[in-house]
Amino acid sequence: MKRVTIQDIADALGVSRNTVSKAINNSDGLAEATREKILQKAVEMGYKQFSYVAALSGSGRFVPTGDSEPPAAASEIAVFTANLSLLSNHFAIPMLDRFKQELSQLGYSFNIYKVDRENLAQHTLPATFDPERASAIMCIEMFDRAYDEMVCTLGLPVLFVDGPHKRYGDSLPADQLLMDNTTGITKLVHDLLGKGIRKIGFIGDYEHCQSFFERYVAFRSAMTLAGVPVDEAFCIKQHSADMDVPLSALPELPEVFLCANDFIAVDTMQALRKLGKSVPGDILLCGFDDAPESRIMTPALTTVHIHTQIMAFTALHLLLSRMKEPYLDYRTVYTATELICRDSTKLTVKEEVK
């Protein structure tokens, strides 16, 4: 079966690709009737995870189709996060907005709890969180493995959106939701190698979380399988606002830096400018997440887009089904992502390596 794309949906409805993308990602600036029409068409055509995670009613809302039961007295879905500040600029915000909308339609309340340093150190719960009121917990930006293991012992359904890295193969006893961290990076590396580029580096702490780890592994695997050695000098694990320090310590710069997310890419671009280097003139740059900043910066940043609305529906499905069937085997689910090539990796014909 042919894979359904955003363009296919746009063609079927006679609207622009950008309009369809806004509807699928729950972006602002779109009439609700138009959004509902597009989402219904996406389900009808079998677009990506929509056919798996939900059916939509005439109102464009999530229909649990047997996955959930009416809320009990404990009807709160709690969200734990160790980094509220990052959530303000993170892909999780549009995902959580949609998630909250759908939960309210099903009769559940929704609250976000900050897990502070003291909680992490002492393995205690946030002061205002009452386990007796909670039906389930969703953890976002929760990368302390020991604390996460404690959360898994509370006797509640737990879903991790991303999570601590599994470098050593140690998984948590809970469901996990991730974005596809491999396909976009693999494709970009393949395309760059096809243009004769060989010096490719990576910036980001691959032990920060599972997503960073998978993006790093995707980069190394793509290089290795193509028979191109990875220059370890071009792999910078450290990330800080002063990226000019590790960059200036390099004997030479690579031709491309792949960054673990867009914010690292933004800091890297600023540091390169301080060193008198331009993107893409002197070096190409790629991020991950498709944060709003990636579209408005100059040059616009090549990145990997996360479909936040699909992640919201998938998270809802995973939590509701776990609440109904607590003894299901633990699941790790990936939602599709999309490589977005912009000016930061743009080569002119003259610049392409022969």
Where are these regions (language model features)?
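Alpha-helical recognition/docking segments in bacterial nutrient-uptake
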Residues: M1, T65-H190, P246-E252, F263
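N-terminal helix-turn-helix DNA-binding module of bacterial transcription factors
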Residues: M1-T65
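Short beta-strand elements in bilobed, periplasmic/extracellular small-molecule ligand-binding domains
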Residues: L103-V115, R220-M243
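Hydrophobic alpha-helical segments within soluble ligand-binding/sensing domains
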Residues: D175-F202, S240-P246, A265, I306-K324
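An alpha-beta-alpha
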Residues: T186-V228, R331-T345
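Short acidic capping loops at alpha-helix termini that bridge into adjacent secondary structure
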Residues: R198-K199, V230-F234, S278-L284
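Flexible loop/turn connectors
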Residues: D244-K354
